[in-house]
Design a protein with these regions (language model features):
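N-terminal secretory signal peptides that target proteins for export/translocation
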Residues: 1-19
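Interaction-mediating elements
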Residues: 37-347, 353-356, 369
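Short intrinsically disordered, low-complexity coil segments enriched in acidic
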Residues: 1-3, 298, 436
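Gram-negative/organellar outer-membrane beta-barrel architecture
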Residues: 188-191, 331-436
Length: 436
């Protein structure tokens, strides 16, 4: 009797699956039969894009060349709408688009939204623009003589369909011969020359715009760590000359941009430091004190020790590194110092918000001093955390567990934390044993 019921249920399941398969098969068959053309709904004057092919001539095998090839392929590639998921060569999405574009609601609209692929036209692919982008990429990677061309090939069986064929002639790459620094102030030039040993550009390396940008960032960081607060990487530009040294070599000259602001060419020193401590509920400071020349503004009662605030804001004076201590004594602005102060304050976890600003001491044209202002909002003093888990031990004991922890921040006014954690669990024996 039991086997009979099982057989009947199996037949019903098979029948249901067969009916669903027939519906799907019929739906696909109707699409195939009705979709006699993928171009019947094209707007006037448009040509359906069916794909592209990229041919490389003299393809470079250098590491830089391989990177260039990858980016050029990505710039030229565009998937047509005549493929499912971009790789199956059947215009399923176009068939759905042609047959269900007329539906505005109901099942037909659902099918359209789910499966239809909007046609891609040759005009929207913009092959000429893609050629320009690919050509610029060749130049960026040192292929100054490289050429990119495109040809639109119309389908001989249907004039409303066409594909695009690109030809990329990379030719020979150019390599760096020399790099000069010029037209900066004498002091700036001396700093740049002293740091040249860390340069990312060297003789014999292939020209690469990415390396040029990284070199500008390196020099900007070098200068900003030695007082040039207003200096930026985009204040420098390159001139490239391929005629000085023949045979595929380029001479580079790094120059300041025209109209470089005078402030960017001046070293700045750190002046007065002010700290504004805001309460955890947004209470504004209503009292202040001065500690070793540092003004501290706070609400009602100072919640951190002033000597610790001074140490955090002048950490370089307390390190063992002689060069860092000398830089601290010189009071030159340093981007590295600014970042380290922000990191150290963030690691304390006692402030919810921090803002460290450097502003000129006055508005005169000869001002070379920056005042420091730290504004920090205290976080809530207590942190609570509850964890729930299930543990299994090697002795077949299994059960739920929980842990509850409380952390008190800034216990002694120096960024210290005090933590209490409670653990609890209930276990029973598994694997055929009795509960315990």
């Amino acid at each position: 009797m039991t086997n009979k019921y099982i057989d009947i249920a199996s037949c019903r399941i098979f029948s249901s699956c067969w009916k669903r398969s027939k519906i799907v098969f019929t739906f696909i068959l109707l699409l195939v039969v009705s979709a006699c053309s993928t171009t019947k709904h094209l707007p006037e004057g448009e040509v359906l894009y069916t794909g592209n092919k990229t041919n490389f001539v003299d393809q470079s095998n250098t590491p830089v060349g391989q990177t260039a090839v990858g980016e050029i392929k990505a710039a030229l590639d565009k998937s047509p709408s005549t493929k499912i998921l971009g790789f199956i060569p059947f215009p399923f999405g176009m068939w759905v688009y042609n047959d269900f574009v007329k539906y505005e609601k109901g099942f037909g609209k659902w099918i359209f939204n789910r499966f239809a692929a909007k046609p891609v036209f040759i005009s929207t692919v913009n092959p000429d623009i893609r050629v320009k982008v690919a050509t610029n990429l060749l130049h960026d990677y040192g292929y100054f003589n490289g050429k990119v061309a495109q040809q639109t090939i119309v389908n001989p069986k249907d004039s409303l369909k066409a594909r695009i064929e690109y030809t990329v002639d990379m030719r020979n790459p150019y390599f760096i011969d020399t790099v000069y620094y010029s037209r900066f102030t004498p002091k700036t030039l001396r700093i740049m020359e002293r740091g040249r040993w860390r340069s990312l550009l060297s003789h014999g390396e292939q020209f690469n715009v990415s390396d040029l940008d990284e070199e500008r960032n390196r020099i900007s960081t070098l200068l900003r760590n030695l007082g040039y607060f207003y200096f930026r990487p985009d204040y420098m530009t390159y001139q490239a000359d391929t005629t000085l040294v023949p045979g595929g070599h380029v001479s580079l000259k790094l120059l300041p941009v025209p109209g470089l602001p005078p402030a960017a060419q001046r070293q700045y020193y750190v002046g007065k430091t002010s700290v504004y401590l805001i309460g955890k509920n947004g209470e504004q400071p209503n009292d202040s004190m001065n500690y070793k020349g540092m003004d501290i503004h706070y609400y009602k009662k100072l919640q951190v020790r002033p000597n610790m605030l001074y140490r955090w804001m002048n950490y370089q004076a307390f390190v063992k590194n002689d060069s860092l201590r000398n830089l601290q004594r010189s009071r030159l602005y340093s981007q590295y110092r600014q970042q380290r102060i922000q990191e150290k304050l963030a690691q304390l976890s006692i402030f919810r918000y921090m803002d460290l600003q450097y502003t000129p001491q006055d508005t005169t044209a000869t001002c070379d001093t920056l005042n420091v202002r730290l504004q920090a909002t205290f976080d809530k003093p207590l942190d609570a955390e509850l964890e729930v888990n299930v543990t299994t031990k090697s002795n077949d004991q299994t059960g739920p567990g929980a842990s509850f922890s409380v952390t008190r921040k800034n216990v002694f006014g120096g960024g210290e934390s005090w933590n209490v954690k409670l653990n609890g669990s209930y276990e029973w024996q598994t694997g055929g044993g009795k509960n315990s």
